[in-house]
Amino acid sequence: ITLKYMFLRSEEEYILTIKNATCAQHIFKCKRNSTECVQTNAGVVDNDYSFLRFGVWFMLNIVAVQKLTAAVHSSVIVCHDEAVMFLGESGTGKSTHTRLWRENIEGATLLNDDSPFIGVRDGRAVAYGSPWSGKTPCYKNENYPIRAIVRLSQAPHNKMRQLRSLQAIGALLPSLPPAFAFDEKLEDAVMNVLSAVVSKVPVYHLECLPDAAAAQLSHDTIFGV
């Protein structure tokens, strides 16, 4: 299914219009600085609920970034009561790596496998579960302080290094909602989220194989074992 949408903004209101192949149309609106978004055509008959899920996710992000919170395309593991967030392009191996944690690191569990939220609360960076978890049904209404964020890339070896602040922002930015780059105010809000998180959490780059040794390396580096 191909999602086709147009994102418009007036001075006071964001509008998201989604149309599917049969021209069923969903319209969502959110006022600037509001904490609510609404679907204006809730009576539309359409059995494809992916459009509703996408629209709610998109508009929720508009509300969230104004509160120093944003969705991140990532897979998040919880270990020792803290969250570790793994980023990467689709197909890089995020889900594989977090599965290796669960199989090889005692006490490691999955928080979300596709679109968790990150934010800053009471001076700490926090990862939140969400109803959007990709192909893995992991919908947890839980949150944990973030221990570290890791950008993954495939390699014929396992090697991990910590990134400097500017590199860290560059590692995170591609994993946040890309459409926000076309709206100056939303882009600024996203950068505020990234700056706040990076100032509180170490960000790493892990070049790795899809093996248990990679999971052990990232765990030991992050938790100082």
What do these predicted regions represent?
Residues 1-90, 100-111, 116-225:
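A noncatalytic interaction/capping subdomain that flanks phosphate/NTP-handling catalytic cores
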Residues 97:
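Hydrophobic positions on the alpha1 helix immediately C-terminal to the Walker A/P-loop
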Residues 94:
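Conserved lysine of the Walker
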